[in-house]
Regions:
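Bacterial N-terminal signal peptides that target proteins for export
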Residues: 1-9
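Sec-dependent N-terminal signal peptides
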Residues: 8-16
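Positively charged
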Residues: 19-191
Length: 191
């Protein structure tokens, strides 16, 4: 009987441990918080493999999913690091982007993009984004990746990259037209 109880207790402990470590949802900070306006710091390459950094990546992925977002940048969870995650099934697979650089391919022009921001509740704004970009970064294994992006992937990457430089979508909209711009867009993607 004691052995049975012990096994049960061990099982219960294991389940609690697994569930508490599997995902931690982080607090998403809102406009007005100074971290959103700071220029985020480069991630030291040797630290990418650190368990704490890998946990931060996992926590950001689960926080993004829980919030119904398609992208989330580290400054939005009050970590001033040059890192973001993005995912929008089926067009954008889960991507972890560390220390990115963007080359805006201006020849392909810009297009309107209606966006919501997880750090600006209730405001969907119409901004302009480049149609095509070249994104270079390190993935979560520390490997260097260099890709051309268009479509929704390019939009999310530009939004998240702005977060690393303290730029929010409210900055990209002319003050005079902002009121008009966020009326009527109810289902904009959150990022
Ligand atoms: Zn945002």
């Amino acid at each position: 009987m004691m052995g049975y109880m012990k096994t049960l207790l061990l099982l219960a402990t294991l389940i609690v441990t697994l569930t508490t470590h599997a995902k931690t949802n982080l607090e998403i900070i809102k406009i007005g918080h100074p971290t959103l306006r700071a220029t985020a710091q480069e991630v030291i390459h040797a630290e990418i493999s650190n368990p704490e950094f890998q946990s931060l990546i996992d926590d950001m992925i689960s926080t993004m999913s829980e919030a119904g977002g398609v992208g989330l940048a580290a400054p939005q969870v009050n970590k001033s690091l040059r890192m973001f995650v993005m995912k929008s099934w089926p067009s954008v697979s889960l991507t972890v982007v560390i220390n990115p650089t963007i080359e805006y391919l201006e020849d392909f022009g810009k297009k309107d993009s209606v966006e919501g921001c997880l750090s600006i509740p209730g405001k969907n704004l119409k901004v302009q984004r480049f149609k095509k970009i070249h994104l270079s970064y390190f993935d979560r294994k520390g490997e260097y990746i260099s890709v051309e992006l268009n479509g929704f992937g390019a939009i999310i990457a530009q939004h998240e990259y702005d977060h690393l430089n303290g730029i929010l979508i409210v900055d990209l909209v002319e003050q005079m037209i902002s009121k008009i711009n966020y009326i009527g867009f109810s289902n904009a993607p959150l990022m």
